[in-house]
Amino acid sequence: MGHILIFGLGYSAGHLATRLRARGWAVTATTRDGRGGTLRFGDGEGVHAALRCATHILSSVPPDEAGQDPVLATYGEALALAPAGWVGYLSSTGVYGDTGGAWVDESAPLRGRRPARNAADLSWRALRGD
C-alpha cells in the first residue's frame, strides 16, 4: 500500500485519512499544533523526513491571510524534489466562479473571487510540472 503525507488534517482530509488507513495505507499528517499524533506543521525535520518516504502528498491548507500558501512557502522546494509519485492540492470549487451548473475540472479557467485561492491552485499545478 501507499504512504500519504497530508498537510492540514482538518475535516475533509481527516475523512480521507480514515478511509486510507482502513485500506492499509500509512498516513502521516500535519496540524498547526501536532495534536493527536500528527506532526506539527513547523517541525521541519519531521516534515522533511515524511516528504522523503511519502508515495503520495496532499495539501488541504488554504492560503493564509496574506494570500500566501503556507505549505509552498515553507516546504515548496522540498516538495518539488520529493520522490512521491502523486502530489495533490485539495482546493475549492469556488476557484471556478459561477459556472451556471456546468461541469468543471482542472482544465477549466479560474474565475473565482478569491485571488489567493486561485493563485494557490496555479502554484500547486506548476509545482512539479506533471
Task: Specify the residue positions occupied by each region the protein language model found.
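Conserved N-terminal Rossmann-fold NAD(P)-binding element of oxidoreductases
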Residues: I4-G8
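N-terminal Rossmann-fold NAD(P) dinucleotide-binding loop
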Residues: A13-G14
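Aromatic pocket-lining residues of Rossmann-like dinucleotide-binding sites
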Residues: L20
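Adenosine-cofactor binding site in Rossmann-like domains, unifying the SAM/SAH pocket
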Residues: T31-G46
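NAD(P)-cofactor binding segment of oxidoreductase domains
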Residues: R52-Y89, R117-S123
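Conserved Rossmann-fold NAD(P)-dependent oxidoreductase catalytic core, especially the SDR/UDP-sugar
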Residues: G76-G112
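Short beta-strand "acidic-cap" motif of Rossmann-like dinucleotide-binding folds
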Residues: V27-A29
